[in-house]
Amino acid sequence: MVRILLIVVVGVLGAIALLEIGLRLLFGFGNPPIYKADEKIGYLLAPSQRTRRMGNRVEINEYSMRGSSLRPAPDPDTLRVMVLGDSIVNGGWWTDQDETIPAMMASLSQKRQKGEAVEVLNASANSWGPPNQLAYVRQFGLFDASTVVLVINTDDLFSKPPDPSVVGRDRNYPDRKPPLAIVEVFDRFAPSQPPPESSPPVAVPRDPVGYNLDAIREINAIATQTDARFRLAMTPLRREIGEPGPKDYELKARDRLKSLAETENIEYIDFLPIFNDHPQPETLYRDHIHLSPEGNRLVSDRLIDN
């Protein structure tokens, strides 16, 4: 009886060990990208980390950018571009390091610059909006980039103020590695923790669109002060493609953004008509908002061409 029990225990432990190894090696569970809270930025990816999720390589440098280590200023013969964005620019765990929009921009630029070195920085994090991006620029600067590109999506026009309380509470923003890959899998199905009572509620602006447009205006002003070229691009939600198109409140927000770009003389690329002209626009998306590798390639190509 004892022998049978021992065999069962060993078998169960062996199965758990195999499951743990499989989850780590095949899917990258147990080693998620870690976030850190920031009073001004809200949150950002913890610096200097590497992992692999679902086979996709994720590397974060010392400035919490998705990319390899870099110097504060580029070499004299290097063209540096800084791309600001949210999960669409960052790529998340579902996008390999070489298939993000900034990585594709760098690859395309190298081919077209005929030998000139090109760096494209990826300063982004999941669910960042213009206020987060502005706070990042204020804290870290523009790294002597000659061009700054802000890529937003329609939802970003309604972004809330930066909220550091999500770090370590929301499963999408872990602040530490789980003890086991199995634990992380179970945590994916557990409800997020409510914000601690000690955390003051984040005040929601009365005019969310105006609040975000002000942040875009300030990013442009900072770029102008450093003689950097500033460019703004917006990708649409999947449901905005075709008919009936954007909802009424989104159309109003879009008009306000276009008016800002005209008033401030900002180079603005609206990808809604570009996506609508694509023969198979559904292939540009992996879900309702995030782009597929083909979508990333189209955006990268347009940002390089203009």
Language-model features: where?
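Histidine-centered active-site loop/cap adjacent to the catalytic His
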Residues: 5, 285-306
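Hydrophobic membrane-insertion alpha-helices, especially the h-region
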Residues: 7-22
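Membrane/wall-proximal cationic-aromatic binding patches
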Residues: 27-108, 112-113, 275-278
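Conserved SGNH/GDSL esterase-like catalytic core that processes O-acyl groups on lipids
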Residues: 57, 81-82, 88-175
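Loop/turn elements at helix/coil->beta-strand transitions in domains of secreted/extracellular proteins
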Residues: 78-79, 116-118, 143-148, 224-231, ...
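Second-shell loop/turn segments in exported
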Residues: 88-96, 122-123, 205-209, 244-247, ...
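Serine-dependent acyl-ester chemistry module
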Residues: 153-258, 263-266, 271-282
